[in-house]
């Protein structure tokens, strides 16, 4: 019983959804055996006849070639093409090929010499002793591709299968209603096909090998069964006739009951499929050592006088084949490459036969029927019922018309096998397959553009990264090539660094408590020590200068007479020396401010008294100078003195004394306030005092004109006394300034009023000086 169920399962076939049953037209061409046709005079071999990129050309115009000689080099998925006959390469140029768009593709043009000489052929009859990789490489280099219509490189397909293939399926369904190429090939070359199947099984090592053939080919079925008699590894499965049972996914489901997932391949479920024509080409490549240079082509249609199947060389013009088949064209004649459901109309008869050409259909006008006008979709869903891929052709049609590429992709447009079943059943005569092909082409173009954009972005980012690396390398080189210090400089640098490290090591860590103020007592003490040292040096220097100015020789003070030869005293020089002394005293006083900050301030001096004393001292100095002038009247006259300059110098001295007096006023702010002094009144009183002193001096001069002159006054002593008086006044003023700083609550005098008063005093003093000069 178990054996019965096992045998039943082995012969079981499944079904797929959808599908149609168009009228059979195979009897037009499958009744005659395969035949050879005369060679054409010129062959056109396109470089790309398969899925993938075209190979690299290895011939040039003028080269002599033999049949089977490679015209291109195949690397990776690039499949080489070979010369179909012996002859001369006349050109390599673009030429229209077998494509609905008739776009020109690069092709090699060969003029045949008629000899049809082969290259040296090396067959591997002992292929079972060869490695799997060697067999796959030979299949690839001999240009074998899928001859069922897809044109996928067979070597690449076998290489990708690897060790995961459990079932090898040989597709012999040939479901198109007009095509009989595989049918006739199985009738005439069944043994060679089985040899090719054994080679494929040797490479893949599958668990089972199945040959699927429709039941509308009785002669082919009988021939294949005869060859497979006694073969246990290869089983023949006869399936019901239904279009499109020859599709890869549909035949896989029929023979195994497994469905290929959306977007996947049959190899994902452990199944690999090859066409019977591909198996025959594999046998000739491995055992006979012949590259793929020809294939079986069906010539059929009511416009063909002698329909049948012929051996057509790759690159043969379509016109040449039809002429030898008795083609009688009519008005508006159509020539279709492929079947009526999955084929396409040729743009011209000069296109060549390629590896995927399996049929040339030339129907009459009555055979194909009058072209029907396309109408609007009525949403009948007949297309969805007929679709073998379980798609929604109606919805895909709307997406294609509306250029909604994303939605079309989301609805699995890529799973469409373009079988034409939907267009066949459409009552509105909508060419759905054409819309789907166009939409696929647009999606591929968009994907290619995105891929190029991504590659360009990757190149740009790589370039930016390279530039950044080069920039970093340049900066590193510049740093390394910078001027290095010499040995001595390096030693000095290391010594300095060592001192810094030692100092850092000696430093105690500073810990600051939260909320506490930093302890700067050490820094303040060091700063105060430096200031005290500087003040001491300044005080010592001032004392030395004052001692030098105050020291006068005793004999000069007591000598009653003035030596006539002695150098007379220049009053201007004396005034300059006095100004210098005052400046030095002022600097010394300023330097001593900070030194005496903590001492008890001296008793403040009344600025009015100081001003009066200064005026008296200046009057005495002037009187002494005038007495000196009278004493030397008979002697050599001294250099004349400019009275205006002297007046200006005196005014400057008075202004400085006034500033000192004003500073002293602030010093007495903390004491009992004295009666406020108006600076203008003080200046007026000082001017009056000076005028009185000057008049008294003049009166004294007139009174003693006839008498013996009084003892002359040394002008230098008078100048020194005046300088000492001014220094005392300035010191008192500075003491007042320190007292003012100690009392922050004291109100400061308006500086603008003081400046105005000082200016008025200077003007009055200048006028008084000019008056004195005029009186003299």
From Swiss-Prot:
Superkingdom of origin organism: Bacteria
Cofactor(s) for this UniProt protein: [4Fe-4S] cluster
GO molecular function, one term: electron transfer activity
Organism of derivation: Cronobacter sakazakii (strain ATCC BAA-894) (Enterobacter sakazakii)
SUBUNIT field: The complex is composed of six subunits: RnfA, RnfB, RnfC, RnfD, RnfE and RnfG.
Pfam families registered for this protein in UniProt: Complex1_51K (PF01512), Fer4_7 (PF12838), RnfC_N (PF13375), SLBB (PF10531)
Main location: membrane
Database matches in Gene3D superfamilies: 3.30.70.20, NADH-ubiquinone oxidoreductase 51kDa subunit
Name of the gene: rnfC
Primary enzyme class: translocase
Protein name according to UniProt: Ion-translocating oxidoreductase complex subunit C
Residue ranges with Low complexity bias: 721-743
Residues holding [4Fe-4S] cluster 1: 377, 380, 383, 426
Enzyme Commission number: 7.-.-.-
Region of interest (Disordered), residue spans: 534-754
Ranges of residues in domain 4Fe-4S ferredoxin-type: 368-397, 407-436
NCBIfam families for the chain: PRK05035.1, rnfC
Subcellular location: Cell inner membrane
Described function: Part of a membrane-bound complex that couples electron transfer with translocation of ions across the membrane.
Gene Ontology biological process terms in this record: electron transport chain
Transmembrane listed as a keyword: no
UniProt entry keywords in alphabetical sequence: 4Fe-4S, Cell inner membrane, Cell membrane, Electron transport, Iron, Iron-sulfur, Membrane, Metal-binding, Repeat, Translocase, Transport
GO cellular component: plasma membrane
């Amino acid at each position: 019983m178990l054996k019965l169920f096992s045998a039943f399962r082995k012969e079981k076939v499944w079904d797929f959804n959808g599908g149609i049953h168009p009228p059979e037209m195979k009897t037009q061409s499958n009744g005659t055996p395969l035949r050879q046709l005369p060679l054409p005079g010129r062959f056109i071999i396109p470089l790309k006849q398969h899925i993938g990129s075209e190979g690299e050309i290895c011939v040039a115009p003028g080269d002599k070639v033999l049949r089977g000689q490679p015209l291109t080099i195949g690397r990776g998925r690039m499949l080489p093409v070979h010369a179909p006959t012996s002859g001369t390469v006349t050109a390599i140029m673009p030429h229209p090929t077998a494509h609905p768009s008739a776009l020109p593709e690069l092709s090699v043009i060969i003029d045949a010499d008629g000899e049809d000489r082969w290259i040296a052929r090396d067959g591997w009859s002992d292929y079972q002793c060869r490695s799997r990789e060697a067999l796959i490489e030979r299949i690839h280099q001999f240009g074998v591709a899928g001859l069922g219509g897809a044109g996928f490189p067979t070597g690449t397909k076998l290489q990708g299968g690897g060790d995961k293939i459990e079932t090898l399926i040989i597709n012999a369904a040939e479901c198109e209603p007009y095509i009989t190429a595989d049918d006739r090939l199985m009738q005439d070359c069944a043994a060679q096909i089985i040899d090719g199947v054994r080679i494929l099984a040797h490479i893949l090592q599958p668990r089972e090998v199945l040959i699927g053939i429709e039941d509308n080919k009785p002669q082919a079925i009988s021939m294949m069964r005869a060859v497979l008699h006694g073969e246990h590894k290869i089983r023949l499965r006869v399936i019901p006739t239904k279009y499109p049972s020859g599709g890869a996914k549909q035949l896989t489901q029929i023979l195994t009951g497994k469905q290929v997932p959306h977007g996947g391949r049959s190899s994902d479920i452990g199944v690999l499929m090859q066409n019977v024509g591909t198996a025959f080409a594999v046998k000739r490549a491995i055992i006979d050592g012949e590259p793929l240079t020809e294939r079986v082509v069906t010539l059929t249609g009511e416009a063909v006088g002698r329909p049948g199947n012929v051996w057509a060389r790759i690159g043969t013009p379509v016109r040449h084949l039809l002429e030898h088949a008795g083609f009688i064209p009519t008005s508006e004649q159509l020539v279709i490459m492929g079947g009526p459901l999955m084929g396409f109309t040729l743009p011209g008869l000069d296109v060549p036969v390629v590896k995927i050409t399996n049929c040339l259909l030339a129907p009459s006008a009555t055979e194909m029927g009058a072209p029907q006008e396309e109408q609007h979709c009525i949403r009948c869903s007949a297309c969805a019922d007929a679709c073998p891929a379980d798609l929604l052709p109606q919805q895909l049609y709307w997406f294609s018309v509306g250029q909604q590429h994303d939605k079309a992709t989301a609805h699995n447009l890529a799973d469409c096998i373009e079988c034409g079943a939907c267009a066949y059943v459409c009552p509105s005569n909508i060419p759905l397959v054409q819309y789907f092909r166009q939409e696929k082409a647009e999606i591929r173009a968009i994907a290619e553009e995105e891929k190029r954009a991504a590659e360009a972005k990757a190149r740009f980012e790589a370039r930016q990264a390279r530039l950044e690396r080069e920039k970093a390398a340049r900066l590193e080189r510049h740093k390394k090539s910078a001027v290095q210090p010499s040995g001595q400089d390096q030693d000095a640098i290391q010594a300095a660094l060592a001192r810094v490290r030692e100092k850092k090591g000696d430093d105690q860590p500073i810990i600051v408590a939260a909320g506490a103020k930093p302890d700067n007592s050490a820094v303040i003490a060091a700063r105060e020590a430096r200031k005290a040292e500087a003040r001491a040096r300044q005080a010592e220097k001032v004392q030395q200068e004052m001692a030098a100015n105050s020291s006068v020789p005793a004999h000069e003070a007591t000598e009653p007479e003035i030596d006539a030869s002695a150098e007379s005293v220049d009053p201007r020089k004396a005034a300059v020396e006095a100004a210098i002394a005052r400046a030095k005293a002022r600097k010394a006083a300023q330097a001593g401010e900070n030194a005496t900050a903590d001492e008890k301030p001296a008793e403040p001096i009344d600025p009015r008294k100081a001003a009066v004393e200064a005026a008296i001292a200046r009057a005495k100095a002037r009187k002494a100078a005038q007495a000196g002038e009278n004493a030397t009247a008979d002697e050599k006259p001294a250099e004349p003195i400019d009275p205006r300059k002297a007046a200006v110098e005196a005014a400057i001295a008075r202004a400085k004394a006034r500033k000192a007096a004003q500073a002293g006023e602030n010093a007495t702010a903390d004491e009992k306030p004295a009666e406020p002094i108006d600076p203008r009144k003080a200046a007026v009183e000082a001017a009056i005092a000076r005028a009185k002193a000057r008049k008294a001096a003049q009166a004294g001069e007139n009174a003693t004109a006839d008498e013996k002159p009084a003892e002359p006054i040394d002008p230098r002593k008078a100048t020194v006394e005046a300088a000492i008086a001014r220094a005392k006044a300035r010191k008192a003023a500075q003491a007042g300034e320190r007292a003012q700083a100690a009392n922050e609550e004291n109100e400061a005098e308006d500086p603008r009023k003081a400046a105005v008063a000082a200016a008025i005093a200077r003007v009055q003093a200048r006028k008084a000086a000019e008056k004195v000069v005029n009186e003299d």
